[in-house]
Amino acid sequence: MAGVRLSLLKSIQRSIKPHATAKSCSGLLNSHARAFTCGNLLDGPKASPSMISFSSNIRLHNDAKPFNYLGHSSYARAFSSKSDDFGSIVASGVTGSGDGNGNGNDWVEKAKDVLQTSVDAVTETAKKTKDVSDEMIPHVQQFLDSNPYLKDVIVPVSLTMTGTLFAWVVMPRILRRFHTYAMQSSAKLLPVGFSNEDVPYEKSFWGALEDPARYLVTFIAFAQIAAMVAPTTIAAQYFSPTVKGAVILSLVWFLYRWKTNVITRMLSAKSFGGLDREKVLTLDKVSSVGLFAIGLMASAEACGVAVQSILTVGGVGGVATAFAARDILGNVLSGLSMQFSRPFSMGDTIKAGSVEGQVIEMGLTTTSLLNAEKFPVLVPNSLFSSQVIVNKSRAQWRAIASKIPLQIDDLDMIPQISNEIKEMLRSNTKVFLGKEAPHCYLSRVEKSFAELTIGCNLIRMGKEELYNTQQEVLLEAVKIIKKHGVSLGTTWDNSTL
């Protein structure tokens, strides 16, 4: 049926004039489309109401593709099966609508069109701006050349003062807006449940940048004004190194402020323990020294000083200096190593070789201890790199061991005494039972006495409490021995007296 209609349309198209072909053909096609979608088809089911209402709005123009949204694949195939131009036009208008990915392709094409339009608009605006500036620059240059005072004094001073006012009034507000936007963006990027602590502006990256940037702009502005006011007093060759040095110092100042803010926030966090806090403090000191050294060398290079040559020449003499001061350098390196490894901290009781005491100060070259007699002892840091360090304060438990001599005549009662002493130790709340069980056994038998050894682990406690607990354990053990009628012995051999 569709083929018959196509034949009729083609015969009518041949009979009309060429200049009216497009218009008449469009009208016939519109009529044919309405007839096709009205639902009175002889070779197919009745069309849906949505298709009828949609197809009734179709209008074909002489420059548009017919049946662009008809959406009937069989009709498209009937027209596209012919080899003439008209059938190819109809097929090209229908083929895209029958594809399920048409909407996605349309959106991609629209996005490309919008992007291309934006690029063209920006390019055109830039071109027009460049043309206007090219036209205005000669006139402005001619005006400034005719007014030397305006060109040499008023305009530079005005621009300099404007930049200074911008740095002191407008820039802090812009930096605060950047800080607010950064905090909001970080909150959006962080996953749900992740702790997001609000950082105040004064302790943020932007807060650390504010003062160095303001003072740098102000310094450059006044240096520029001074060079204009007194060009003979301030030589031109000194202006560029001065500005470079100011930029370097401002950068070092900014890095130091930012580093201080970050470390302060880290130390204020509750998740940092004692050892981590000490490491962060050490990192703070080392980074400060490094920033100072880098800033000093960069400033010297900016001022024309050949730092590399100085370091090369100084390296030769540095070898001899290193041999002469190897003890000092050894103490310094050992101090830096201890700052990072942290074998002990302030307040710990340590023992290194023959030195024992409580740590009261840790320096870069020496460490101060307080010995048992409460005398301060100054120990070189190089000693700790060659000795075994025992840190008593970090022990999770303390072991005690005591030996009690008994009379040799009471050996039969020792097994019963040992069992009762072990039960007494197990029932003590200050005895640590996690690693080793308390023990009490006969460790030595001599001619005149027998020796009973008592040992256990105590929980972590202070020195005074440790001594009191040890005394309590010994007194309880003596009570058990006395209860069984056993007398304490002596380790001296009376036969030799």
UniProtKB/Swiss-Prot annotation:
Disulphide linkage map: none
Presence of keyword Transcription: no
Superkingdom as given in the UniProt entry: Eukaryota
Membrane topology (UniProt): Multi-pass membrane protein
Gene it is expressed from: MSL1
Protein name, UniProt field: Mechanosensitive ion channel protein 1, mitochondrial
Localization annotation: Mitochondrion membrane
A Pfam family matched in the record: MS_channel_2nd
Listed GO CC annotations: chloroplast; chloroplast envelope; mitochondrial inner membrane; mitochondrion
Alphabetic keyword roster: Ion channel, Ion transport, Membrane, Mitochondrion, Transit peptide, Transmembrane, Transmembrane helix, Transport
Entry function: Mechanosensitive channel that opens in response to stretch forces in the membrane lipid bilayer.
Similarity comment: Belongs to the MscS (TC 1.A.23) family.
Entry's Gene Ontology molecular function annotations: mechanosensitive monoatomic ion channel activity
Listed GO biological process terms: cellular response to oxidative stress
Gene3D superfamilies, per the entry: 1.10.287.1260, 2.30.30.60
TM spans (from-to): 152-172, 216-236, 238-258, 280-300, 305-325
Boundaries of the annotated transit peptide in chain numbering: 1-86
